[in-house]
């Protein structure tokens, strides 16, 4: 199952148009019922425009953080964007992604040449790692955060913020481990 965007009815067929409509309705319902705007992962950069008026936070996933188009799009957003460390765990790759999104860029988007101003609110998200044996390796410990702080300082980035994602490899994908 690829998610609601691809298949809005779990038992039905793929229907991305209906998926876009349903995801948008879901975000609107959250706003109406809670008064809070949503956060979402930018899985497909070209689709962000369908939700941009409803989101107050975006994340770029571990498998997309090195993707140039994700970096370009993130550099032009007016909301905070969290760049996850890749599945291998590299802080350096994550910080390079943050540095790229904090800079101005000129790029093609939906057939147009656009220029971004850079996103000063871009920051890191620690989601743990998977080692060569397939074992999960958490990266939220004090020593990890100290190492990340030192690496952040060396890069001289605008926003030295980090979010710890307690899911994924930081909990071994076991929900009951998330609260420790």
Where are these regions (language model features)?
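Short helix-capping segments at alpha-helix termini
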Residues: 155-157
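Active-site-facing alpha/beta catalytic cores
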Residues: 1-147, 151, 168-178
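Conserved, mostly hydrophobic/aromatic
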Residues: 164
């Amino acid at each position: 199952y690829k998610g609601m965007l691809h298949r809005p009815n779990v038992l039905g067929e793929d229907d991305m148009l209906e998926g876009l409509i349903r995801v948008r309705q879901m975000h609107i319902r959250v706003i109406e019922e809670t008064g809070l705007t949503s956060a979402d992962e930018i899985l497909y950069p070209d689709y962000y425009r369908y939700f941009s008026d409803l989101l107050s936070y975006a994340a770029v996933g571990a498998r997309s953080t090195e993707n140039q188009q994700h970096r370009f799009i993130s550099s032009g957003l007016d909301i905070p964007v969290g760049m996850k460390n890749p599945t291998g765990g590299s802080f350096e790759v994550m910080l390079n992604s943050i540095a790229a999104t904090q800079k101005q860029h000129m790029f093609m988007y939906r057939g147009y040449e656009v220029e971004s101003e850079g996103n000063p609110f871009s920051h890191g998200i620690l989601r743990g790692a998977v080692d060569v044996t397939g074992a999960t390796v958490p990266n939220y410990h004090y020593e990890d955060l100290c190492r990340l702080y030192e690496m952040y300082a060396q890069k001289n980035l605008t926003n030295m913020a980090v979010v710890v994602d307690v899911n994924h490899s930081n909990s071994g994908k076991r929900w009951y481990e998330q609260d420790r």
